[in-house]
Amino acid sequence: MIKKIYMLLLTVLGMGAISSCSDYLNSEKYFKDRLTLEKTFESKDHVEEWLAYAFSFIKNENYEVTTKGPSENSFCFSDDMYYGDRDKTIDATKNELSYNMFKLGEYDENTYNVGAWGACYKGIFQASVFIHNVDRCQEMADWEILDYKGQARFVRAYYYWLLLRRYGPVPIMPDEGVDYTQSYDQIATPRSSYEEVAQYISDEMLQATKELQYDRRTDNYAIGRPTRGAALAVRAYALIFAASPFANGNNDEYAQQLVDDEGRRLLSSEYSEEKWAKAAAACRDVIDLDVYELNIVNKSTSDNGPSERPTVTPPADGEFSKQPWPKGWTNIDPLRSYRTIFDGTILPANNKELIF
């Protein structure tokens, strides 16, 4: 009798478990709520979310080497800021982000933010999907779609720029992406040469200038979005690097060893003066936009406390000391002209030195 009751209990429990498992495994109701790619890009809100996600990989692993840290200054895009309290020449125990460490080449692939490679390619993938699908949106004007596409194209090329600076020659992924269900041998993408990556960045940034709708932005809420000026500036940077001795006629031992899977040199062994000409022309394109200029504060004799002291006369500098701006500094305050860029006096949208 006891055995029969025991078997009955097991049967009831088993049926309950099967019923529970059946409910648990019945996930169809959840998949019905999932948005398809086509449906996602019909909504402007979802379009903006996707674009923001594509940009999100610029943070974290891709902080500039001179960014002090996530809590102090996590959105610094400058590559020339310097923090003395993180310099091993001052304190040997504080070398986490020493500018000198990078300036002097005292680092390796394991030194700083080793996750940058994966983060960049994730961003590249998200931007590529966006570029191929944003035209589906019916809630945006044509000019908005074009501008958003230009922003995505900019950030995709910007990720390649970050990769080029950090790793040198890298694989350029197919624009339409890859079929991850195929074998590794079918989807493996070899490294492109340094020149090819730089040229890709140049071409993509040039295309972005045809899509982006602003030379520079004057809205403080949109100041972080890329512009034609930003695209042309990154293009100029990439071409300057490609023209440099590192990638232009480099026959050092390491350059000879840097080859792809078929033995092709990835750093050019032949010097080309034309590369410098292209880089100079690209820099000129930024200047010719005529939307950027140095911030100038006029010379002052007033003494209104710490915020405005009389102009300190700089050391003599030949003819520059005797002429008004822009040929000299006799009518400006050089110190305050520089300081007001960083002390909060000028909002980002009003800072005509700010490109991106």
Predicted regions and their residues:
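Aromatic- and acidic-residue-enriched carbohydrate-binding clefts of CAZyme catalytic domains
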Residues: V178-A188, V259-S268
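TPR/Sel1-like alpha-solenoid repeat signature
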Residues: R153, L232-A238
